[in-house]
Amino acid sequence: MKTYVLQALLLTLAVAVVRAANTGIEWPPKPQKCAEGETWKECVGSSCAELTCEHPEPSLGCTYDCNYGCYCAPDFFRNANKECVKKDKCP
């Protein structure tokens, strides 16, 4: 019985690896050129990756997901127009 369960798990893992390899998506993604006030971040939690004009203080807890992309650089805040601006430019 243990042998069958182990074989099933290995087969499932093999199928998942093959599917991931055939998606054409590079992982992890290569760093991209970011807009002014942004910086490329790797494997950051989405809830703590950047501050916003609406929420200028860091949250108490961060998620453990792993995201890649352009996020507001230190001392910049994401505004309603999705731009990273200095604090004095926040409404």
UniProtKB/Swiss-Prot annotation:
Coiled coil: none annotated. Disulfide bonds join C34-C70, C43-C66, C48-C62, C53-C90, C72-C84. InterPro entries: Ser_inhib-like_sf, SerProtInhib-TIL_Domain, TIL_dom. GO terms for molecular function: peptidase inhibitor activity. The keyword Lipoprotein does not apply. Residues 34-90 form the TIL domain. It is found in: Secreted. SUPFAM superfamilies: Serine protease inhibitors (SSF57567). Pfam families: TIL. PANTHER family: GEO11767P1-RELATED (PTHR23259:SF69), RIDDLE (PTHR23259). Tight-binding competitive inhibitor of chymotrypsin-like proteases; inhibits host chymase, cathepsin G (CTSG) and chymotrypsin. Inhibits chymase-mediated generation of vasoconstrictor peptides: angiotensin II and endothelin I. Reduces chymase-mediated vascular permeability and vascular endothelial-cadherin degradation. This is Ixochymostatin. It comes from Ixodes scapularis (Black-legged tick).
